[in-house]
Amino acid sequence: MTTTRRNKRNNKLYKNIKAIKLSIASNDTILNWSEGEVTKAETINYKSLKPEPGGLFDEAIFGPVKDYECACGKFKKIKYRGVRCDRCGVWVTESIVRRERMGHIALVSPVAHIWMSKELPSPSKISLVLNISYKEVEQVLYFVNYIVLDTGKIKDDKIMPFKFKEVLDLTGKGSLSTRQKMRRVIGYIFRNLIKSKSSEDYRKGKIFYESLKNSSLPFSLNDAFNYIKKYTGFRVGIGAEAILELLNKIDLNLEFSRLNDALRKAKKDSVEDAKVKKILRQLETISWFRNSKLHPKNMILHTVPVIPPDIRPIIQLDGAKFTTSDINNFYRRVIIRNDRLRRILEDGTVPSIVVNNEKRLLQESVDALFDNSSRHKPSLSKDKRSLKSLTDRLKGKQGLFRHNLLGKRVDYSGRSVIVVGPELKMYEVGIPALMILKLFKPFIIHGLINKFDENGNEIRPIAASIRQAEDMIKNQDDLIWGIVYDVIKDRPVLLNRAPTLHRLGIQAFEPRIVDGKAIRLHPLVTTAFNADFDGDQMAVHVPLSENAVNEARAVLLASKHILGLKDGRPIVTPTQDMVLGNYYLTTERKGQLGEGIIFSTVYEARAAYESQKVHLHAIVGISTKAFPNKKFACQGTLITTVGKIIFNDVLGNNVPYINDGEFDENACPEKFIVKQGEDVRQSILKHQIIPAFSKKVISKLIDLLYLLLEFKDLPKTLDNIKALGFKYSTFSSTTVSVFDIPKYTNKQNYFDSADQQVLKYKQFYNKGLLTDDERYKRVVKLWNNVKEKVSDEIQNLIKQEQYRDNSIVVMADSGARCNISNFTQLFGMRGLMSKSFNYERNNQSKIIKDTIEVPIKHSFFEGLTINEYFNSSYGARKGMTDTAMKTAKSGYMTRKLVDATHELIINHDDCGTRKGIVVEAIVETKTKSLIESLFDRIVNRYSITPIVDPETQKTIVEANSLITTQLAKQICATSIKEVLVRSVIYCERENGICQYCFGIDLSTGKLVELGTAVGVIAAQSIGEPGTQLTMRTFHTGGVSTENNLAQGFERLKQIFEVVTPKDFEKAVISEVKGTVKSITTVQNAQEVVIKSNVDERIYTIPFSAQIRVHVGDQVSPGSKITEGSVDIKQLLRIAGIQRVRQYMIVEIQKVYRIQGIDIADKYVEIIIRQLTNLLQVTDAGNSNLFVGQLVHSHYLNELNKSLLLAGKMPVIAINQVFGIDEAASKSNSFLSAASFQDTKKILTDAAVKNQVDYLLGLKENVIIGGKIPAGTGFLTDEELTFLGSKTVAEEY
């Protein structure tokens, strides 16, 4: 007989998932998921290789192995779909259901879920709910000790000393005490409760009484407990059954009230107190269970779900061998042990100790299945490898989240070495013909077999079949190329260079077919990719869908990425050959061929140069009317060179004539123009030579071009500058020769003098006048000074007139290659070399000796001695390892930053906030040097209140208005020292940020668009330059000065991870507002007294610390009294969250700007928003929250508004600061947090909470395979198509 049913599989794509809920599955739920019970441990039949019925791969449970074919072969083909075979019981359907259908194993004895019973380092959920320690729960579950389930009828503590839920230690140190208690109870029973002394029970009681006295005598504990139970009703239990009974008895409401009362009696203010912490943890877990309406008994399993077989496959290898997923081994063990326990229990004659042992083995086998790695002794394979359980499949870099869901291998991709493509346009890339034929193969085949043209007319196809088309492609038939060109014309490709540190690491290009096997890359985009042509490889990806193609063109095309993200400066600046060519082109020289000629048109000047009547560098005149589209301060004859006329000719309209490096953005200055009636030739003779355009000038010019030109014209102009550079660097005939190096001979005198000084230091040390540390510091300083003198002299030498046209000097001067340090090493001296040093170790010396004190005196030109070469190799290797370390650490930090901020997306125009941050110039207080100007901090942001000139009372910027470059300059020209601006920190959008709080998008120079993923951009902008930061930690002599603190990467890590600074680098800060009354020296320390309006505070400071205040100075809470790093958590306690945020912004900017890296404040603020937006409840008021709970500031504000409007008591909470690790883990999305770190803990907490993930961030949507709610995810398909076609129309 056959039966039919509707196929349970829903073929609809899960595109409209709005949210995902995670909760603890009850036993009923597991049975509901299941398609049948797995009763056998077998997998497949070794002869037929078919799944065994009732086994782990049973087709009746999990579905057919072959599409629409039952196991016995009675029903085949799609026409029987939905039919169940009456012989083998298999539903006839698609085999893909074997990836979806689940089974179950019905357990004979309940077991605890290991996630709920073992959660180190924090207590497990079971121990928190039952209020017994984690260790005791473990002892009960693994049949080591019994737990009291019922204290019975006797309520007198003297007779019945056992407490409810007390774990009876019968194996450890407390066993003697437990035995004594049991003796007391048994003694009472046989003396007082048994009337007949001759009865069997009296005799038994006496035996138990004696046995408990002498631990060497064997007796059955179970019998003893049954004896006590018979007369008193006292009951104990062991294993998961006992825990289940206790969980069934729990009253969550009663428990919640009890914990709240306990919290009120405890020290409520001190959340750090151990007792309070324990109560808060319990309260949190009980609250989660109460609010989720889940019963704690679900933490104990009666059935184990069996995951679909195709997720744990058996794979056939060569030579009739098989390999299987580790999970199958775990399931087999569970089934075998479960069956054995069933037989034992059915027998009924087996001693309880053996039964308990079998139950323990079953518990352990289920533990191993769920989480093998967290067990004391994980299950191992034959080769002693720890087997991968279900938890291991989820967590880590190779786990499901990071390996399969967030990062997948991509089809339609290729990779090859890159070479320069100077002939390409900015949006083009040269792809080898072989690669094109592979990547675009399906599209080319479609074109070859297509029977209709683009107008719908029937045509004769080039190939008759797909096979023929494939052969034509394989043989590279001449007929295919027309189709190939048509295909690539419609399809851009994405180029990616690893490591992708920021979004410019992936850009789109229009492909062009090139010969060879290397990808040809446009030279201007190399900076964005951080690529060079020394063997770098790049990957190519093909966007397949129409929307993907449109998105690639509309958003990712390389010609759209002119500005860098972190600072808004052009990232497509010409380099090397291009710089050199433009430098040569714009060079001026007196006495050149054709000097003094006056031209009336640009064409005339070009013709004269091409017919060799005038030299490129000759100073000539040209009428300003020759440039009708360029602005001049006045009309007349412009004094310039033919090279500059050619250079300006490619810059396009609306750009003023560029005649020197100090150009004006409005018009060419009057000083270069000879007015009518004045002697032009005389002016040419008097003309001062203007330096040629170096790399800095060209970079500044690109800034100007970005402001003046329309966006669509800019890439073309940049291409023109590139083409000029390559052309004229060829014409310049610049060569490099060892004989170009200038001769420098003066260094020996410095060396002789320094050698004598080193000898003196050694003598002083031998006499005990200097310590070894002092001698070392002086020697290193001496040789550094010598190198500086040599370097200065070389710098002066190469500036001499005789080296004006020297090829190497020209390269350095133009910025094309090399700098003064290279020259010093090339023909001066190499100087001191660094050596490896463990900065973390505690060494006896108080200074870091990471420099070899013997310098390399020879230059590369002279050649190094063997000793010098050997010494220099230390530094070279240290450089390589440091770079590798920095790259890894920086990459990890970027990942953490992205995880903490990815949910921040621009999703509104104006949140209407009235709060902002006060910004002022960041100045190094000790040296008074400027780190970040007020202009840099306010430009491209929105004001909150009107900004008024204090002198004239004139409003410069209206309230809620953009501070443009022009307005920022006006503000800085007044006496205004601080400005209140809008900030992402105080944006009132709950999920995301509004446009006005963020301000201008630095990559476009316009108001940030809706859908911009500013969180990820901020993380990339801060993480990407991380590799450029120094790794060195300076601490000299234990003295804490500004220079001796953790710097560079280590300091950044200290701030982002909110690490308490070490004692020697920690700054003492004032707790009060007041005046420094006195600074005195007391025994072994200094005392600073600060007088406030209320009292006086005395701060005792060791001599090793450097005091930065003086008597009479005004201080406020949080002001530094000594130099050093402030403990952020201490600052929060003393001065509040606002001060903490300001301090963190300033300190992060210091780290980057000292290294010469500019990052916009707004990116730093985004990170700080995520680190400081949680509060801890101190008084729950009339809300459902509990004391100690962490809540988001936006949620709290809304909750308090509703409470106050209802006339109820609001919630009181204090701000908290978390490091980026914790910030990422405390995300509202459990999918995002679980894919970051602590996967097991986050999923356990989410399941207990019955948590709903509303998929608001980027990662959650990538995980479920949906569109991210950012970028073009905000656009309709029609808008995207329009943007894509508009970009094609703008291509030049």
UniProtKB/Swiss-Prot annotation:
GO terms for cellular component: DNA-directed RNA polymerase complex. It catalyses: RNA(n) + a ribonucleoside 5'-triphosphate = RNA(n+1) + diphosphate. Disruption phenotype: Probably essential, it was not disrupted in a global transposon mutagenesis study. InterPro entries: DNA-dir_RpoC_beta_prime, DNA-dir_RpoC_beta_prime_bact, RNA_pol_asu, RNA_pol_N, RNA_pol_Rpb1_1, RNA_pol_Rpb1_3, RNA_pol_Rpb1_3_sf, RNA_pol_Rpb1_4. Zn(2+) 1 binds at C70, C72, C85, C88. Binds 1 Mg(2+) ion per subunit. Gene3D superfamilies: 1.10.132.30, 1.10.150.390, 1.10.1790.20, 1.10.40.90, 2.40.40.20, 2.40.50.100, RNA polymerase II, clamp domain, RNA polymerase Rpb1, domain 3. Keywords: DNA-directed RNA polymerase, Magnesium, Metal-binding, Nucleotidyltransferase, Transcription, Transferase, Zinc. The keyword Transcription applies. HAMAP family: RNApol_bact_RpoC. This is DNA-directed RNA polymerase subunit beta'. It comes from Mycoplasma genitalium (strain ATCC 33530 / DSM 19775 / NCTC 10195 / G37) (Mycoplasmoides genitalium). The gene is rpoC.
